[in-house]
């Protein structure tokens, strides 16, 4: 099947071809036709499967067909982090380049002046994080009366305890008659129950079993004393010289500490987490994507904007508290049919978390005892 078979219009097809995409992914095959008919969608597919295009392409096509153009926001895409908002905005920029559809992105952590100026000029699609969106709404800069399409991206994070209050404040501001699209890499039962109350007879799309891991990723657990994790990391990085490596840390403090430890060992790295300025985070991401640095230390929330198709190695320096997060983390490697490796460092107190991960994914992980 090709994108042309999905009844996508010529201007968007041209942009897709320029991106080098020949065939749609499974989530795109199922979601794009349904979205083009205006149906609500509840879509669950792993990281790196093309979810962004699955909602962006039909929304652009819907808006391009409008006869009456004005400055109002017609599509709202809500996402949990600044990095992910920027990533989605870049995709829309690519797919909409040969259309009249205008889009913009807003997020916190930067001066609002440029964002307000952009809103005054008018945008058809607005990509936003919840905090800045509500802030600018309260100031009277944003009105959602004409929103026809509402997207909640990475729904399991957006509807988590940290965002639920923002979502509840936002929903009454949206028109009752609209298309609602929920997309996420994981869809726990608690989220499904909540989305069922917000979606109208949605088309439910699940491309892989929830919280599964792809077969292209070789997964290994290293049982190691907590104090020896740094030595193990340095050893592995020396053995994988030349490869880009994404290392996950549970906390911001530990991410910075790992950078210092690696620096003393002569290994250059950068950390990306919520305490870093927006400019610092963007700079670090760019350095990692272009290969200026080969090792990136990231916390889970900050890593949402890291989108590299050929990342060979992911290391879990700390195990995540939530097993679904493990799936998200290692989903950064083994993309688009490429082989990937995921290594996890597990101390004595973290061993129960390994059992939770194996129970969730249905896979036994290879185990290695590490001792200096």
Question: Which positions does each model-derived feature cover?
Answer:
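Conserved helicase RecA-like core
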Residues: 2-372
């Amino acid at each position: 099947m090709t994108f042309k078979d999905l009844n996508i219009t010529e201007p968007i097809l041209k942009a897709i071809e320029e991106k080098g995409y020949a065939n749609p992914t499974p989530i795109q095959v199922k979601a794009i036709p349904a979205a083009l008919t205006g149906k609500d969608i509840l879509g669950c597919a792993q990281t790196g499967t093309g979810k962004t295009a699955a909602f962006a392409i039909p929304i652009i096509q819907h808006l391009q067909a409008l006869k009456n153009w004005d400055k109002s926001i017609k599509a709202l895409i809500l996402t949990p982090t600044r990095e992910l908002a920027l990533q989605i905005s870049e995709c829309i920029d690519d797919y909409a380049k040969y259309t009249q559809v205008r889009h913009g992105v807003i997020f916190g952590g930067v001066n609002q002046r440029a964002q307000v100026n952009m809103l005054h000029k008018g945008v058809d699609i607005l990509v936003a994080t919840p905090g800045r969106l509500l802030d600018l709404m309260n100031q009277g800069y944003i009105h959602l009366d004409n929103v026809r399409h509402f997207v909640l991206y990475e729904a399991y994070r957006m509807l988590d305890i940290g965002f639920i209050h923002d979502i509840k404040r936002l929903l009454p501001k949206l028109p009752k008659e609209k298309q609602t699209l929920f997309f996420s890499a994981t869809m726990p039962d608690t989220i499904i129950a909540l989305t069922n109350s917000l979606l109208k007879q949605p088309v439910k799309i699940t491309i892989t079993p929830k919280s599964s891991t792809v077969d292209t990723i070789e997964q290994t657990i290293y049982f190691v004393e907590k104090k020896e994790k740094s030595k193990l990391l340095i050893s592995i990085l020396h053995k994988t010289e030349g490869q880009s490596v994404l290392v996950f840390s549970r906390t911001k403090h530990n991410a910075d500490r790992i950078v210092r430890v690696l620096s003393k060992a002569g290994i250059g790295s950068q950390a990306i987490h919520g305490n870093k300025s927006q400019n610092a985070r963007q700079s670090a991401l760019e350095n990692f994507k272009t290969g200026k640095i080969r090792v990136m230390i990231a916390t889970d929330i900050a890593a949402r904007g890291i989108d590299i198709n050929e990342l060979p190695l992911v290391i879990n320096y700390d195990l995540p508290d939530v097993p679904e997060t493990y799936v998200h983390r290692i989903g950064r490697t083994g993309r688009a049919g490429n082989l990937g490796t995921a290594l996890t460092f597990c101390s004595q107190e973290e061993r129960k978390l390994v059992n939770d991960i194996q129970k969730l994914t249905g896979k036994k992980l290879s185990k290695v005892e590490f001792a200096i």
